[in-house]
Regions:
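Patatin-like phospholipase
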Residues: 1-19, 27-248
């Protein structure tokens, strides 16, 4: 985002759609500024996802429910999002946060299995795109945390007797709300260098992809060194894309 900001491209972006950590970045950026977004990540505690109790203790106490509750805690991340995400101060035209409906809150992981079956095999979509500016502050905060809640790794976010998980479970490239909003040019920032986006039945829309040349490494590594490496890699890859456009 810093490279897109410095090149002047970001100011022309009217809609943003994100899933998982992309949803968090979009929500914090849209609620504050590019400088504040960077400050959040450069100052995040290295043990941000550490649980108060060891996993073995929780397994002995809760058995399989411990897995359903998540291996790691989202408390610190949730607190950070509470401080920096506000639909009241959103300055982008519209931001969509992607979440995956994991089914009945009382069904545990079986609810997610059922939702996956319905989404992928029965084509009954279980992905939800939430417009940040239409949510209350509490709803916006819960939506961003849910979008980052990787099943088993983190606990689901519960709402209206359903459990909601990482948006990437059902849509890792959430461009649908952008197309429905009338966007005719979309920039996709990929975090998986092995993934190739294959647009289907998209007419009149130009798709750009910014892809990483290097592996991003551990997603739960919040050491200062790793965060700096990720930041630099993202900046260089985006800048390379920006510079390549100048000569097209």
């Amino acid at each position: 985002l810093r490279a897109l900001h410095e090149s002047g491209i970001l100011k022309d972006v009217q809609y943003i759609s994100g899933t998982s950590i992309g949803a968090a970045n979009a929500a914090v950026y849209a609620s504050t500024s590019i400088d504040q977004l960077e400050s959040v990540w450069f100052n995040i505690p290295e043990n941000a996802y550490k649980h108060e109790k060891p996993l073995l203790s929780r397994l002995l106490e809760d058995k399989l429910k411990a897995i359903d509750k998540g291996i790691y805690s989202m408390d610190t991340f949730s607190s950070i999002m509470m401080q920096h995400v506000s639909p009241i101060t959103v300055h982008a035209k519209r931001v969509f946060v992607t979440v995956s409906d994991g089914g009945d809150e009382n069904k545990g992981l079986f609810g997610l299995v059922k939702s996956s079956y319905e989404h992928y095999l029965r084509k009954d979509s279980k992905v939800i795109y939430l417009p940040l500016d239409e949510l209350t502050p509490k709803e916006a905060h819960k939506a961003v945390v849910a979008s980052c809640s990787i099943p088993v790794v983190f606990p689901a976010v519960k709402n209206d007797h359903h459990k909601f998980y990482d948006g990437g479970v059902f849509d890792n490239t959430p461009i649908k709300p952008l197309i429905q909003s009338g966007c005719d040019e979309i920039i996709i920032i990929q975090l998986n260098k092995q993934y190739f986006f294959k647009p289907e039945n998209i007419k009149g829309v130009t798709i750009h992809e910014i892809k990483h040349k290097k592996s991003l490494g551990g997603v739960l590594d919040f050491s200062k060194e790793h965060i700096n490496q990720l930041y630099q890699a993202g900046f260089e890859d985006a800048l390379a894309w920006v510079n390549a456009r100048k000569y097209q």
